[in-house]
Swiss-Prot record:
Homooligomer. Interacts with glycoprotein G. It is found in: Virion membrane; Host cell membrane. Residues 1-29 are intravirion. This is Small hydrophobic protein. Belongs to the metapneumovirus small hydrophobic protein family. Glycans are attached at residues 76, 121, 149. The keyword Translocase does not apply. Viroporin that forms a ion channel probably displaying low ion selectivity. Plays a role in counteracting host innate immunity by inhibiting TLR7/MyD88/TRAF6 signaling and STAT1 phosphorylation, leading to down-regulation of type-I IFN. It comes from Human metapneumovirus (strain CAN97-83). Keywords: Glycoprotein, Host cell membrane, Host membrane, Hydrogen ion transport, Ion transport, Membrane, Phosphoprotein, Signal-anchor, Transmembrane, Transmembrane helix, Transport, Virion. The chain crosses the membrane at residues 30-50.
Length: 179
């Protein structure tokens, strides 16, 4: 060993023997400690890199979906589809939601706009829009236009959940039937 040769030729035999013993006794432990530190640093570096790549991929997915929606939409708004049928549970949910946030009961045709967050699978109920009492509108499309244009004769109630990457918007309608 080069180190031992240097020590041997450098000093007295007593000092040399003592230093040889220290190096021999502790060199293995020091190397093991250095290897463990290197392994831990490698593990943390790989973990941080993997998490960074996941976040970057999610961000790119959100951005690409947002950009594709902007390209598909002529007026830089998200695409809108109108649905006229609802199952009973969803209708009941919206009736309760409207009642809670507006202190009113659905007794007329109603439309609401639903935004879906595809990145984290969150559904956001942007706002509810009610047909005016005196209106003769019977079509969901016409009612949707009225709500979308925020006519002064339509009342709005907002219920929003914070989320990111929203790119799908649907309108749903409930037609109140008079029994």
């Amino acid at each position: 060993m080069i180190t031992l040769d240097v020590i041997k030729s450098d000093g007295s035999s007593k000092t040399c023997t003592h230093l040889k013993k220290i190096i021999k006794d502790h060199s293995g432990k020091v190397l093991i400690a250095l290897k463990l530190i290197l392994a831990l640093l490698t593990f943390f570096t790989i973990t941080i890199t993997i998490n960074y790549i996941k976040v970057e991929n999610n961000l790119q997915i959100c951005q690409s979906k947002t950009e594709s929606d902007k390209e598909d939409s002529p007026s830089n708004t998200t695409s809108v589809t109108t649905k006229t049928t609802l199952d009973h549970d969803i209708t009941q949910y919206f009736k309760r939601l409207i009642q809670r946030y507006t202190d009113s009961v659905i007794n007329k045709d109603t439309c609401w706009k639903i935004s879906r967050n595809q990145c984290t699978n969150i559904t956001t109920y942007k706002f509810l829009c009610f047909k005016p009492e005196d209106s003769k509108i019977n079509s969901c499309d016409r009612l949707t236009d009225l709500c979308r244009n925020k006519s002064k004769s339509a009342a709005e109630a907002y219920h929003t959940v914070e989320c990111h990457c929203i790119y799908t918007i649907e309108w749903k309608c409930y037609h109140h039937s008079i029994d």
